[in-house]
């Protein structure tokens, strides 16, 4: 199945200068960093990937109101596909597609057809798609919890190093 047979594909309309630090809505730009905006142009569930920069490496799952940069692509309005499942599928395989296409020509930006004409295999039942998405989401949650714990230990170690190596705390 081609991606274009599964969903609609479009781009945003906003520019980076449209960001507002304390904005109401998420604003997805050409980066993994999510900015803020006081306006939204979409209110849907979908998948975003960037059009240039670290192509094939930045993906966002969205659900609700958001603003979107003009060089970002949104896949939405899916036909019988669990969107979170599609997020995992697309984010896993799209980078390899970018690499394969770059062997034929220099690829420094994404074109709509790179997404639209990508072949994907989708389990036939929504139940299987949801089961896969749930397992992968649980794994991501576990990884995030471990990373948060790791970051906390690093901060504690830094504090201990500061105290011990400056002599503020003595062990003997």
Predicted regions mapped to residue ranges:
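Hydrophobic aliphatic residues
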Residues: 6-7, 90, 164
């Amino acid at each position: 199945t081609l991606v274009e047979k599964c969903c609609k594909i479009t781009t945003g309309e906003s520019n980076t200068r449209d960001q507002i630090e304390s904005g109401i809505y998420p604003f997805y730009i050409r980066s993994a960093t999510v900015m803020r905006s006081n306006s939204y142009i979409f209110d849907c569930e979908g998948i975003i990937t960037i059009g240039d920069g670290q192509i094939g490496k930045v993906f966002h799952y969205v659900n609700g109101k958001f603003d979107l940069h003009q060089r970002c692509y949104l896949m939405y309005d899916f036909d019988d596909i669990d969107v979170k499942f599609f997020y995992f599928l697309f984010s896993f395989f799209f980078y390899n597609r970018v690499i394969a296409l770059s062997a034929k020509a220099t690829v420094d930006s994404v074109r709509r057809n790179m997404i639209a004409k990508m072949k994907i295999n989708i389990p036939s039942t929504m139940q299987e798609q949801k089961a896969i998405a749930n397992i992968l989401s649980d794994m991501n949650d576990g990884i995030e919890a471990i990373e948060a714990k790791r970051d906390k230990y690093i901060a504690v170690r830094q504090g201990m190093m500061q105290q011990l190596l400056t002599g503020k705390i003595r062990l003997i």
